[in-house]
Amino acid sequence: MAVDVTEYHLSVIKSPPGWEVGVYAAGALALLGIAAVSLWKLWTSGSFPSPSPFPNYDYRYLQQKYGEAYVEAKLKRVPPWNDQRTTTRGPPSRKGSLSIEDTFESISELGPLELMGRELDLAPYGTLRKSQSADSLNSISSVSNTFGQDFTLGQVEVSMDYDGASHTLHVAVLQGKDLLEREEATFESCFMRVSLLPDEQIVGISRIQRNAYSIFFDEKFSVPLDPTALEEKSLRFSVFGIDEDERNVSTGVVELKLSVLDLPLQPFSGWLYLQDQNKAADAVGEILLSLSYLPTAERLTVVVVKAKNLIWTNEKSTADPFVKVYLLQDGRKMSKKKTAVKRDDPNPVFNEAMIFSVPAIVLQDLSLRVTVAESSSDGRGDNVGHVIIGPGVSGMGTTHWNQMLATLRRPVSMWHPVRRN
């Protein structure tokens, strides 16, 4: 009997029934199908549409990436910054970061603009408002071959810190590059002077450096300074070239407000972009701007807070100012928004938020041009002056942009001189 059973098993193995082969084949095909579907889902879940070159008005791209409900959601959502406090002054907040659920709940209770106003700590300036969209990207007053460009005369690397115990400001001039590149003159050597504004107090003068466009200064200066003076003083870094007649000629200057650096809390170190002294002095007012970028929502927020000491065009005694903000990509105008008009006010408070959809992959190709203009009856308006902010510009424009990128999700506010057009 045992032999018969063994022979039966051997016969089944050598020549199995047809129905059993079919069951095995169907099971194998089912497993292969499940594996193929799983791999396909993994593949499609990791793929995204290529970035749109027009992220602010190509909603097909946004719908493809975020779903059909994104257009409605983008009108209701607000960036959930991690820090509860968002001013650039003072230590970082110790409160926990806002969760998405908490943010949406706050939006439902307060409304998105009121919540943003609380995050930016703009209560002293009134209610935060939404800016107006501007349809025209080719207005007569803004068309120019150099619309999104700002020129630099070299860079200097500096560092500074404040000793609260001795009330002393320490300034170090580390190095410079491309300092003597001027077409109209040739210089054999140069030096740098550091002064404290507005009193023009000399902080220090570097040694003369010869025959070098890239220079290592490595010099340190100190000046007594009361803590209250940090809010009103500025440092000016001036580079002078020495020509063949031994004359000192200004080849570039940059000014840095101490109030934006938080020196009592942490040292500052960075590259500053030099400008022509004539352009730096040709200011027609100042404007306070706040920038923040939320990478998860790919959203750039610009808040036009206020302006002061505006000088009107054509020696006017009065005018009605407003602000236009252009988003530029590689110098091309991609989007434009503007504030409301303020009537007869050289120190207007705008307090308006402008939100741009910006994929992170194109962030380094972007810049902002902020133009202060005068409203007119024909609707065209005369430009008072402008500010350019971005990675490829100079002065405070690049400092503000880099600080925004260094503190993602946290708005950074800075004053900018408004340069005459």
From Swiss-Prot:
Membrane-protein topology: Single-pass membrane protein
GO annotation, cellular component aspect: hippocampal mossy fiber to CA3 synapse; synaptic vesicle membrane
Gene disruption: observed consequences: No measurable change in basal synaptic strength or short-term neuronal plasticity. Neurons from the CA3 hippocampal region exhibit an impairment of cAMP-dependent long-term potentiation in mossy-fiber synapses.
Modified-residue entries (Phosphoserine), positions: S97, S99, S214
GO biological process: long-term synaptic potentiation; presynaptic modulation of chemical synaptic transmission; spontaneous exocytosis of neurotransmitter
Domain C2: 152-272, 283-416
Pfam families named among the record's database cross-references: C2
Residue ranges that the UniProt entry lists as topological domain Vesicular: 1-18
Cytoplasmic side: 40-421
Superkingdom per UniProt: Eukaryota
Keywords associated with the record: Cytoplasmic vesicle, Membrane, Phosphoprotein, Repeat, Synapse, Transmembrane, Transmembrane helix
UniProt modification remark: Phosphorylation of Ser-97 is required for mossy-fiber long-term potentiation.
Outcome after substituting S97A: Loss of phosphorylation by PKA. Reduces long-term potentiation in mossy-fiber synapses in the hippocampus but has no effect on short-term potentiation
Tagged with keyword Phosphoprotein: yes
Intracellular or extracellular location(s): Cytoplasmic vesicle, Secretory vesicle, Synaptic vesicle membrane
Entry's transmembrane regions: 19-39
Family listed: Belongs to the synaptotagmin family.
Described purpose of this protein according to its UniProt entry: Synaptic vesicle phosphoprotein that enhances spontaneous neurotransmitter release but does not effect induced neurotransmitter release. Unlike other synaptotagmins, it does not bind Ca(2+) or phospholipids. Essential for mossy-fiber long-term potentiation in the hippocampus.
Subunit comment: Homodimer. Can also form heterodimers. Interacts with SYT1.
UniProt cross-references to PANTHER family, sorted A to Z: SYNAPTOTAGMIN, SYNAPTOTAGMIN-12
Protein name, UniProt field: Synaptotagmin-12
Organism placement in taxonomy: Eukaryota, Metazoa, Chordata, Craniata, Vertebrata
Gene giving rise to this polypeptide: Syt12
